Regions:
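Catalytic phosphate/metal-binding cores of nucleic-acid and nucleotide-processing enzymes, i.e., regions
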Residues: 1-79
Length: 79
């Protein structure tokens, strides 16, 4: 199973409605949008082993945080 699929299952088990943002109008936007009633929307950038966080992705994460959303990086550290 790909790491992103595992991340989706993890957040669904936590009660989130998870949307895979496959195509967006903004480059560098997070991979997943996780929604839960009564909580601030959570954007998750998924990084598998060997992937690196790009400067534009860091910029977009901060941009989302400045708008009041949560934005995190979920990095696979297992080898």
């Amino acid at each position: 199973m790909k790491y992103q699929a595992k991340v989706i299952k993890k957040y669904e088990k936590l009660g989130y409605y998870v949307i895979d943002l496959v195509v967006t109008n903004k480059k560098g936007i997070a991979d997943l949008l996780c929604l839960k009633k009564g909580e601030v929307p959570l954007f998750v950038e998924v990084k598998d082993i060997g992937d690196t966080i790009k400067p534009l992705q860091r910029y977009r994460a901060k941009e989302l945080q400045d708008l009041g959303f949560e934005s995190i990086f979920d990095i696979n550290k297992k080898r």
